[in-house]
Amino acid sequence: DYGNGMPDGQQGWKQASKNFKIAGIRTSTSVTNTNLTITYRLQETNSKYHVSYTLYPSGMIHVACHLETQPDAPELPRIGVRFRVPTDVNQLEYFGRGPEENYCDRNNGTLIGYYKSTAEQQYVPYVRPQENGHKTETRWLALTDKNGEGLLFIADSNFMEFNVSRNRIEAVSYTHLT
């Protein structure tokens, strides 16, 4: 990413991810579900990001995201959702490519299967702090505490990708000695 100048060319998206503002909220309720849609304005890229949560009586929540960009918006390498869970929710099980980290452009050496790990085991101490522990072609992911209580994520169609980290990338310091 540094070789092609991505950190410089993508600053608008990075700033937008830190400064998004709520532009609107819509709710609706039916006999079968309740829907909450939040629209965020990303000022730096003149874009809108819509996140829709549909809640079902079973406890299931369906999350759908949609990004509206302008034709002159900077290139966007990918888009996703990050969220925090309690620190004791550190157990992970998934069905996808693993067990090593892998990305869509370099995942042929990892096999599709069922894997178990922890958030701590996903950490890779790269010299320059960066995303790590990424997994591709995931069908489902369970994040739980040691008692097995937590969240289950199921890909709607195709697959999903994920990584689990104890810290935000921006909060990690360099690990090399000076």
What are these regions (language model features)?
Residues 1-177:
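Beta-strand/loop-rich accessory regions of lumenal/periplasmic or secreted enzymes
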